[in-house]
């Protein structure tokens, strides 16, 4: 999945996570299929997919209270076992499928090795687009994201609709 330049250091004292842009080419190619249509107010489009979590920092394993991991151990990225992505179109439909599987995260403290199960990711997107003869545009899409981990599974699903007149109005 390639080595990429590192991110700038950001000090975030707020309640919300700082999101960094994706730089890995595998995840950048075809990513527009997984992005929901933009908002009418001109804001950023919504997405359920944050590819930066894939192969990111692993979950710490359960350990006795007296075991402390170093900052270096806590910040190690998890190795990816593999990932598969396909995007394409058939008629008025565009689709995208993405699956990735992480290896188990291994931590070491005081000469003892601890491990935590890796996470599996799956994302599916189906988008129907209709570009009218008069220049108008309609789109209806479905997006589903799933993560599987021994401690917790998560699911998020969404439907989006986009309509733009030939004059460029919503």
Where are these regions (language model features)?
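Outer-membrane beta-barrel channel domains
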Residues: 1-170
